[in-house]
Amino acid sequence: MKKKDPIAEARRYVDNARKALNENGDLDLETKLYQDEKYVRAAGNYLWLGVLMALDAVFHVRKDRRTRVDINNYLEAVGKRDIKLLNYVNSGYDVMHLSMNYDGIPAKEVSDSGFRLANAIIDRCEMMLA
């Protein structure tokens, strides 16, 4: 069985997040707020999972798929190699995981920031793998 490219898979998660918001998020153009926080939460979850997939491809923090890894393990591994990426991951955790996934903040600016950070992290991980 051919192993999947983790960066391509991470980008697929970002596409799924975009699709979840665009097709179901019901954006109010006047207020720039999504009307259904369920899809904001789903998009945040997809984005964060894609980011973790890209980070694991570079840093191999998660040794076993069945075990949970604390965010601090990722931050420690990233901080040893790339401070700029560490800043992206810290911000990404706050935006994608906490603000979007847990809090379901419906502001389009928050979601746009999540997509921008996810793409920046994945791009940086891809560069590190090259």
Residue ranges and their predicted role:
Residues 1-130:
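Terminal alpha-helical segments
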